[in-house]
């Protein structure tokens, strides 16, 4: 059974295939083409422990375009809130649906779901990984930079979070140079070590740096919120630590005119990014958000084929 828990388990050619299918789906969508639903009568369960805008709506829209009915639920609506096990819950869901997309606090919950599932489990965000976001990031950079490989991207800010991790993974699969720009306290050198094998095969370069000047010459500058869901107690400390890594006009000037600005959203305007950047001519965040839908279609089609 093939799941999408992280992109680590996907070979470089599989990642590239997903992106090419995503681009084809987008081309057909923008042309207004109405095509025969690929999976009529199938059901996708959206099991979400956390709030969501883009992930929930992109998956729901993607499913509808493929002929799949998306059913949204939360733990509080299920017997799991009263003590039913994850294992038993997944055994039941497997009888009703063709796939389940889960947005969870702990990545271990996803792993347990997959162990007891007879259907594909899709990571719709966990504390460690956000593979659906990374696929949309890659599609956006491909569109803007004009190439799928040999892309240079700088992730600025909380380089330890799930979005940065998944960006590094997909970069290793596609032969990118991924510069993780942030304070040394947040570096995860083990991630670089884990990606070394893929990087050696694809020619990728993944590294950490605390110098904001490392954004120079990149194809994209990427940031995310400084206080992710679940880290509210550390809010003030994180803001103090990450303040030097705000993406503002000065940072974009260092990056250069060809660099696009990326953000997975929602943005805390005035914190990790200034209004003039996210609303400026180099911003690609709305294309990036749209691409969540097209890459979700590719993932669903690949896992359900």
Swiss-Prot record:
Pathway annotation from the record: Amino-acid biosynthesis; L-arginine biosynthesis; L-arginine from L-ornithine and carbamoyl phosphate: step 1/3
InterPro entries registered for this protein in UniProt: Asp/Orn_carbamoyltranf_P-bd (IPR006132), Asp/Orn_carbamoylTrfase (IPR006130), Asp/Orn_carbamoylTrfase_sf (IPR036901), Asp_carbamoyltransf_Asp/Orn-bd (IPR006131), Orn/put_carbamltrans (IPR002292), OTCase_ArgI (IPR024904)
Pfam family, one: OTCace
Similarity comment: family membership: Belongs to the aspartate/ornithine carbamoyltransferase superfamily. OTCase family.
Domain of life: Archaea
EC number: 2.1.3.3
Binding residues annotated for L-ornithine, in chain numbering: 162, 224, 228-229
Name of this protein: Ornithine carbamoyltransferase
GO CC annotations, alphabetized: cytoplasm
Biological role stated in the UniProt entry: Reversibly catalyzes the transfer of the carbamoyl group from carbamoyl phosphate (CP) to the N(epsilon) atom of ornithine (ORN) to produce L-citrulline.
């Amino acid at each position: 059974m093939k799941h999408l828990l992280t992109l680590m388990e996907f070979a470089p050619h599989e990642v590239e295939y997903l992106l090419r299918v995503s681009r084809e789906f987008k081309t057909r969508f923008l042309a207004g083409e109405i095509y025969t639903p690929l999976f009529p009568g199938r059901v996708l369960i959206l099991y979400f422990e956390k709030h969501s805008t883009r992930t929930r709506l992109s998956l729901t829209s993607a499913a509808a375009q493929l002929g799949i009915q998306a059913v949204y639920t939360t733990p509080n609506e299920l017997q799991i809130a009263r003590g039913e096990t994850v294992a038993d819950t997944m055994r039941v869901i497997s009888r009703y649906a063709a796939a389940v997309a889960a947005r969870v606090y702990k990545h271990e919950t996803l792993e347990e779901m997959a162990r007891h599932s007879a259907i594909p489990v899709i990571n719709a965000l966990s504390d460690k990984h956000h593979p659906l976001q990374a696929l949309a990031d890659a599609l956006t950079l491909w569109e803007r930079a004009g190439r799928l490989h040999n892309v240079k991207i700088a992730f600025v800010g909380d380089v330890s979070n799930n979005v940065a991790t998944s960006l590094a993974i997909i970069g290793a699969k596609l032969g990118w140079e991924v510069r993780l720009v942030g304070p040394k306290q947040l570096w995860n050198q083990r991630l670089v070590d884990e990606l070394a094998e893929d990087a050696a095969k694809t020619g990728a370069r993944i590294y950490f740096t605390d110098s904001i000047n490392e954004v120079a010459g990149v194809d994209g500058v990427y940031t995310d919120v400084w206080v992710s869901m679940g880290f509210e107690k550390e809010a003030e400390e994180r803001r103090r630590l990450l303040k030097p890594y705000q993406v503002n006009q000065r940072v974009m000037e260092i990056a250069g005119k060809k660099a696009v600005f990326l953000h997975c959203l929602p943005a805390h305007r005035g914190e990790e990014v200034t209004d003039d950047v996210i609303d400026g001519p180099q911003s690609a965040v709305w294309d990036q958000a749209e691409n969540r839908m097209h890459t979700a279609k590719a993932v669903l089609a690949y896992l359900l084929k």
